[in-house]
């Protein structure tokens, strides 16, 4: 991902304030509520029968935290996202058969959640930088797909 020095600074400054537990669970939960067909990859998570069930599901929260911890690794390696996410790309492609479009959806949901949490601090410039990052991460995760 090509970011200017200002964009990198904006992304890392905001990310330093992110509560990974909270934002991760909310982002994954929103993905599952807004795009219900994504739930088929999470059969083992138990009750996903309603928005309240999804948002309160401890497995959704735990996996959301895991997802954002991986995203954090990507932020430390913006110049090598494909390398950073190579194993995860392989897992999601070969074993889990996740539609790579879902990575884009989750990235966009994450941007919405960040905007919700940070309000005025999430300026259009910060959003533009994050859109570049989530697009780069989605692209890296889709890399192993044929």
Curated annotation (Swiss-Prot):
Modified sites of kind N-acetylvaline: 1
Phosphothreonine modified-residue sites: 12
UniProt key word Phosphoprotein: yes
InterPro entries: Globin, Globin-like_sf, Globin/Proto, Hemoglobin_b, Hemoglobin_oxygen_transport
Spans through the membrane: none
Gene Ontology cellular-component terms listed: blood microparticle; haptoglobin-hemoglobin complex; hemoglobin complex
Residues where heme b binds: 63, 92
Record-linked CDD domains: Hb-beta-like (cd08925)
GO molecular function, one term: haptoglobin binding
Modified residues (Phosphoserine): 44
GO BP terms: hydrogen peroxide catabolic process
Keywords assigned by UniProt, alphabetized: Acetylation, Heme, Iron, Metal-binding, Oxygen transport, Phosphoprotein, S-nitrosylation, Transport
Domain Globin per the UniProt entry, residue ranges: 2-146
Top-rank lineage group of the source organism: Eukaryota
Tissue: Red blood cells.
List of residues that carry N6-acetyllysine: 59, 82, 144
Main function: Involved in oxygen transport from the lung to the various peripheral tissues.
Assembly notes: Heterotetramer of two alpha chains and two beta chains.
Protein name from the UniProt record: Hemoglobin subunit beta
Species assigned in the record: Mellivora capensis (Ratel)
Record lineage: Eukaryota, Metazoa, Chordata, Craniata, Vertebrata
């Amino acid at each position: 991902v090509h970011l200017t020095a200002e964009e990198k600074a904006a992304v890392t400054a905001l990310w330093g304030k992110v509560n990974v537990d909270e934002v991760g669970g909310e982002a994954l939960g929103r993905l599952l509520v807004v795009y219900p067909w994504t739930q088929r990859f999470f059969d083992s998570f138990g009750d996903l029968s309603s928005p309240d069930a999804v948002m309160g599901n401890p497995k959704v929260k735990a996996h959301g935290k895991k997802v954002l911890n991986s995203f954090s690794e990507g932020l430390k390696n913006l110049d090598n996202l494909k390398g950073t996410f190579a194993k995860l790309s392989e897992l999601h492609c070969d074993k889990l058969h996740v539609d790579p479009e879902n990575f884009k959806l989750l990235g966009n949901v994450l941007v919405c959640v960040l905007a919700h949490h940070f309000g005025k601090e999430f300026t259009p410039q910060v959003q533009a930088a994050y859109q570049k990052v989530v697009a780069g991460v989605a692209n890296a995760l889709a890399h192993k797909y044929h």
